Structures are given as structure tokens and as C-alpha cells.
A protein has these predicted regions:
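Bacterial N-terminal signal peptides that target proteins for export
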Residues: 1-13
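Second-shell loop/turn segments in exported
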Residues: 47-49, 64-76, 104-117
Length: 202
């Protein structure tokens, strides 16, 4: 009986070890697996260019997010760096550098992005990071909007994340030039902005 018990204990131990190692290996595989992401451009996703993120990209994102694993604030800083790298890869895929904000009359111009394109692409990146379990302190939320013209604000969209405390944060890439740092601050503050002042968007 004692011998059988010993065999059972060893078998159980090996099962646990294999499960843990297997889960870790699966996590590593997911983090480096290739992914094709459709990149919107031309305003309101008039065009879509496929961006292939391979193992090298996965390793780069993993290193970036690992550096922000210490706190929610550090992770948001890492997300900013991940967005900048993602936009550099986007530029290489499309071959055209997007200008900051949106120029009226630039609709259907390949490579130029309005806030719909920007928020859609950023959301896709955040989902990519979440799928690979690279976000420890935040989860991806639905994109948010503000502005209705009648309230003196031009309609504007942004990607959104939330922290464990429930605070929602925008990841708004529209204002910066392509590859620049996105605006990351509370959604509640973002909702109040965007009033037309001196002919410019705030």
C-alpha cells in the first residue's frame, strides 16, 4: 500500500509540474505567436492594410511591458512606448507617415488617419497585448467618444483601458505625430475637453 501511495504522490507531483511548465510555455508561445492586424487609414477605415506582427515583434512588446510591471503608472508608461513602437511598424507597413490630428479634405488619402482610424488601430494593439497577457494592471475597454457639434465640440474617438480600481484611461494617439507619445489620462477629464477655442481643437 505504501509503495502504491508513493507512486501516486510522485505521479501527482509530476502532473502538477508538467501543468505549470506547460502553462508557462503556452504563455510564452502566445506572447510570441504571429498576428495579422488590419490597420485602418484613409479616414473612417476607408482603407485597411494588413500588418504582420511576428515573433520578434512579440518579444519587443514583451520586453516593453515587462519594464512596466512594477505598478499601474509604470504600465501606462510602457503602454505609451508600445504604442510608439506599433506606429513605427504601421508606418513601415503602409509606407506613408500619418500627420498629427486630421486635415480637412484628407479623406481617402492613403496613410492619413482620423480619430476613427487611430482609435481603432490603438484598440487592436491593446487587444493584442491583452491576448498575450502582457497587461497586468489594466484591461481593454470599448472605445469612447465625445462631441456632438451642437455642444461646440467636434466628434472625437479614443481607445480606452481601465485599471483595477475601475478608473478608465484614454489612450489617444490622434494629437501626436505618427510614432509620438499618445495622451494617456483619465477618461473623465478627456470627456470635458475638445471645446473649439480660437478656431483650434482643445
Amino acid at each position: 500500500m505504501g509503495g502504491n501511495l508513493g507512486v501516486f504522490v510522485r505521479a501527482t507531483f509530476l502532473t502538477v509540474v508538467i501543468t505549470v511548465v506547460g502553462s508557462a510555455a503556452a504563455g510564452e508561445l502566445a506572447a510570441t505567436a504571429s498576428k495579422r492586424i488590419p490597420i485602418c487609414h484613409g479616414y473612417s477605415c476607408n482603407y485597411r492594410t494588413m500588418l504582420a506582427l511576428g515573433p520578434a515583434d512579440g518579444a519587443r512588446f514583451r520586453a516593453i511591458l515587462r519594464a512596466g510591471a512594477g505598478s499601474p503608472q509604470a504600465e501606462r508608461s510602457a503602454i505609451s512606448k508600445a504604442v510608439r513602437y506599433f506606429e513605427q511598424r504601421t508606418f513601415r507597413a503602409i509606407g506613408v507617415r500619418d500627420l498629427p490630428q486630421s486635415e480637412f479634405g484628407a479623406s481617402r488619402i492613403r496613410g492619413q488617419m482620423d480619430c476613427v482610424d487611430e482609435s481603432t488601430n490603438t484598440h487592436a494593439l491593446l487587444v493584442y497585448l491583452a491576448e498575450r497577457k502582457l497587461l497586468r494592471f489594466h484591461k481593454v475597454e470599448r472605445n469612447a467618444s465625445r462631441g456632438l457639434f451642437v455642444d461646440g465640440r467636434y466628434p472625437h474617438w479614443t481607445a480606452v483601458i481601465s485599471d483595477r480600481g475601475g478608473t478608465e484611461w484614454v489612450v489617444d494617439t490622434w494629437y501626436a505625430p505618427m510614432g509620438g507619445a499618445p495622451d494617456i489620462f483619465p477618461l473623465s477629464q478627456w470627456k470635458k475637453r475638445g471645446v473649439l477655442e480660437s478656431g483650434a481643437l482643445n
